[in-house]
């Protein structure tokens, strides 16, 4: 599945627009790790526990968006975006969304 942030793909034409697709997940940090992160926040440095949580959340949200796109018959997602929001202390939602499309080779480029 091709996923791009642009609205067009060089050498391809959009033969069908299938609409909005999205995937999301909400993740919370383990209380013990949260205490460690609070201490790290005082002394400085990367909060690796949160970084890992957000990386996993992105992967899950994108995977769910791809499942949504495939269910609609898409072979690509254009105008892809990621958004995150805090839903409560220690928990965040990750949302992946874009436009599901069917792309085909643009043979008109070869004719020029």
UniProtKB/Swiss-Prot annotation:
Pfam families, A to Z: YbjQ_1
Superkingdom of origin organism: Bacteria
Family: Belongs to the UPF0145 family.
Family annotation (PANTHER family): UPF0145 PROTEIN SCO3412, UPF0145 PROTEIN YBJQ
Protein name stated in the entry: UPF0145 protein CD630_17110
């Amino acid at each position: 599945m091709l996923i791009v942030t642009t609205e067009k793909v060089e050498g391809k034409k959009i033969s069908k627009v299938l609409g909005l697709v999205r995937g999301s997940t909400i993740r919370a940090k383990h209380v013990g790790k949260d205490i460690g992160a609070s201490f790290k926040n005082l002394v400085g440095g990367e909060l690796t526990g949160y970084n890992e949580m957000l990386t996993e959340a992105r992967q899950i949200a994108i995977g769910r968006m791809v499942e949504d796109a495939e269910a609609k018959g898409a072979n690509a997602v254009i105008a892809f975006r990621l958004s995150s929001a805090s839903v409560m202390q220690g928990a965040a939602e990750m949302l992946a969304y874009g436009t599901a499309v069917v792309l085909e080779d643009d043979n008109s480029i070869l004719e020029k």
